[in-house]
C-alpha cells in the first residue's frame, strides 16, 4: 500500500460468469493492497466474501443506464393486435449469456402456431458458428439506436447465467419492457 494514495478496486468479474477457474484467485490476489473494494452487485460480493475477502471497507454500487437513450419516450406498448415481440441483446458472444434458452426459443418458433404469436429478435454478437433459423438478428448497436430498437419490442428476455450485474436488462427495463429472466447472478 502507498501511504500517499488511496486505491479502489471495482469487482465485476468472476469465474462463475464464464466457467473459468483462475479469475477469482487473480482478483483476490490483486485485492491484497487495495484500500476499498466496490462490487457491482450483492451476489458478486457474497462470492468473494465466501472466498476470503473482507466485507469491511467495501460496498455495493449498482449500475444504471443512460436515461437519455433508455426511456419510455415514444414507446408503443403491446395492444394484443400483433404477435408479441420478444428481444434480447448482448455484446458478448459467450454461451453463458443465455444461448441455451435462445436456441430453445428458436426451435419453438419452427411451429407455425408460435410463429403467429411470437417474434424474437437478438441484438449483438453470436457465438462462433452459431446461427438462428427463426430469430431476427441485428449486429450490436450504439446506445441511441439500441434504445430505439428495444422500444420497438414488447418483452425482454435474458437467459444469462451467473451475470454479476448486466446492463442489458437495466436498459430494457428503462425502456418499459417487462423482463423475463433466470434467477441467476446479480
Per-range role (PLM):
Residues 19-21, 49, 64-82:
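Acidic anion/phosphate-binding donor-loop and adjacent secondary structure
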Residues 76-109:
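Conserved donor-binding/catalytic core segment of Leloir-type glycosyltransferases
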Residues 2-18, 38:
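Active-site proximal beta-strand in glycosyltransferases
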Residues 32-57, 65-69:
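A short, active-site helix/loop in glycosyltransferases that binds the activated sugar's phosphate group
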Residues 147, 170-174:
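Short alpha-helical segment that forms part of, or immediately flanks, the ligand-binding pocket
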Residues 178-181:
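Short hydrophobic beta-strand element within catalytic cores of glycosyltransferases
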Residues 124-147, 155:
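Nucleotide-activated donor-binding/catalytic signature segment of Leloir-type glycosyltransferases, i.e.
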